[in-house]
A protein has these predicted regions:
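ADP-ribose/NAD+-binding catalytic cleft of ART/PARP-like enzymes
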Residues: 1-52, 68-75, 87-90
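ADP-ribosyltransferase catalytic core
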Residues: 41-115
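Peripheral, non-AAA+ core regions of ATP-driven protein-machinery
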Residues: 111-127
Length: 127
């Protein structure tokens, strides 16, 4: 695990509901996450999930183990965010590699599908 005290750019996968608001995928998922506001991480133990307090983010918009479109019609979108008071958490490449667990996060903007494709191409050296 690596700790980071500086503010960095990160990416987070969220649910976008019909109301246009953004929501976490699994933990505390009934509460929307506003754009442009700093949010403090809180601990919400949830059955079936390991307790890892912090906003779960990525260094790149990569989460190959998660689907973007579900049969339920749920839409998932990537957002660019800033995080503070974070640490990296090593995960297998099949889960996107290292995750970021941040104590503070601010969503900057939603990324378009084209932006996500471009960022992945740059990450894999195809751009």
């Amino acid at each position: 695990m690596t700790k980071g005290g500086i503010r960095i750019k990160a990416y987070k996968l969220l649910r976008k509901k019909k109301d246009g608001l953004l929501y976490p995928l699994f933990i505390h998922k009934q509460y929307s996450t506003p754009i442009g506001e700093w949010m403090q991480a809180e601990c919400y133990p949830t059955k079936g999930f390991s307790v890892r307090t912090g906003w779960h983010c990525c260094f790149q918009p990569l989460a190959p183990h998660l689907k973007m479109k579900l049969s339920s019609g749920e839409e998932r979108v990537w957002v660019e965010c800033e995080v503070e008071d974070w640490e990296s958490y090593d995960r297998p490449e099949s889960q996107g590699g290292s995750w970021i667990l941040a104590q503070r996060m601010k969503i900057i903007r939603e990324l378009s599908d084209d932006e996500v494709i471009q960022l992945k191409a740059e990450y894999y050296g195809f751009a």
